[in-house]
């Protein structure tokens, strides 16, 4: 079946991961240190231990509002996201690829990032996408499972074989969607891996899609 929809992962695919890394690894420990009167090093150790206690198999892991409550952090998490807006960086080729592919296909975002983050991260890019899906926010799932992809296909009214997807997680962006018949590609920006369904930037992905679809 001809392709109708092209799906993109978010962090590491469309934008650099710096925004989330700073919030989870620096800002939250910094606020915790301020609240508890700790050094940043000790605060980071305690906060990371709290993260591990929850673990990434639970939706709370991804929920910044939950962590502000759990850690009794000062301030408003929304203000923190706004304060870090300036570090958001799309990869250089992203806008051009979206402009060109958007002329032929419906474009969507499928991410396991919370919607609160996505809304900030997508500033300047939102116009390209007909739908933006967050696994934890929209479906209460912590990973991009086969069930997650099936629900997306139902919502956008397309068969899996008419959707392409690209992302930087081997299992959740490549193996899982590919097992359902999607034209999935693993994005390896570091260039360490090579293969017929491995691409190293989104321009290479675009070229593969155009070859596939004639």
Language model region names:
Residues 1-6, 16, 99, 110-214:
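Asp-based, Mg2+/Mn2+-dependent phosphohydrolase catalytic module
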Residues 2-96, 116-117:
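N-terminal helical cap/lid subdomain that shapes the substrate entry/recognition surface
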Residues 85-89, 109, 140:
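Short, surface-exposed alpha-helical recognition segments that flank or form part
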Residues 105-107:
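Short beta-strand/loop segments at the ligand-binding rim of alpha/beta enzyme cores
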């Amino acid at each position: 079946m001809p392709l109708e929809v092209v799906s993109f992962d978010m962090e590491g695919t469309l934008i650099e991961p710096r925004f989330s890394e700073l919030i989870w690894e620096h800002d939250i420990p910094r606020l915790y240190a301020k609240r508890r009167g700790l050094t940043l090093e000790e605060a980071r150790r305690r906060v990371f231990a709290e993260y591990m206690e929850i673990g990434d198999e639970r939706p709370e892991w991804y929920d910044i509002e939950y962590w502000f409550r759990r850690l009794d952090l000062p301030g408003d998490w929304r203000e923190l996201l706004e304060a870090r807006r300036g570090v958001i960086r799309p990869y250089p080729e992203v806008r051009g690829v979206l402009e060109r592919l958007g002329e032929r296909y419906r474009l969507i975002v499928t991410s396991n990032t919370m919607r609160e983050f996505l809304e900030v991260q997508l500033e300047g890019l939102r116009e390209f996408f007909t739908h933006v899906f967050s696994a934890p926010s929209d479906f209460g799932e912590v990973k991009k499972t086969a069930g997650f992809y099936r629900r997306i296909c139902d919502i956008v009214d397309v068969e899996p074989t008419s959707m392409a997807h690209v992302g930087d997680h081997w299992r959740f962006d490549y193996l899982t969607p590919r097992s359902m018949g999607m034209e999935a590609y693993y994005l390896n920006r570091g260039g360490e891996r090579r293969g017929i369904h491995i691409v190293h930037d989104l321009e290479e992905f675009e070229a593969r899609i155009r070859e596939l679809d004639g």
